[in-house]
Design a protein with these regions (language model features):
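Cap/insert and terminal regions of metallo-dependent hydrolase folds
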Residues: 43-133
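Core dinuclear metal-dependent hydrolase active-site scaffold
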Residues: 1-50, 132-139
Length: 139
């Protein structure tokens, strides 16, 4: 792990216009042309999309993937995103990397593979579906 000294971070909150309860995410400028956005616990809506266009990274909930998501429809039931929803949004908004989290625990052994493969059907960038406590560098 590299330690960067003398870095200035600009972090600001964004109203996520959440449906269930008032929520705020954040955008962090971590270099002159790179941003990391945390999108909270609900589906990202059109009012929020303008803030994340061209971000280097987004961290988003993705409750389910594939056929399971199509059948259960977590967007309608709980206002949680699906892998497909996040991947299509990221592709449309020119986001370079997505981190998918806040998912079901139905198949933890294969979840990472399932989520990444599903996202790659709709998105050309990098996809991360970390296990709890897994770490990786954000560059």
């Amino acid at each position: 792990m590299n330690i960067i000294e003398n870095i200035i971070l600009n972090i600001y909150s964004i109203d996520l216009n959440a449906f269930k309860v008032k929520q705020f995410g954040f955008i962090m400028n971590y270099s002159p042309n790179k941003q990391f956005a945390f999108l909270g616990d609900e589906v990202c809506n059109e009012k929020t999309e303008k803030y994340i266009k061209d971000c280097e990274w987004i961290f988003s909930d993705a409750y389910m993937a594939g056929k399971e998501a199509e059948e259960y429809n977590p967007i309608e039931r709980h206002h949680h995103s699906t892998v497909k929803f996040v991947a299509e949004m990221a592709e449309r908004l020119n986001i370079k990397n997505i981190i998918l989290s806040h998912s079901t625990d139905n198949d933890l052994e294969h979840r990472k593979q399932i989520f990444i493969e599903d996202a790659k059907k709709y998105y050309k960038g990098n996809v991360f579906a970390p296990y709890d406590l897994e770490t990786f560098e954000i560059v």
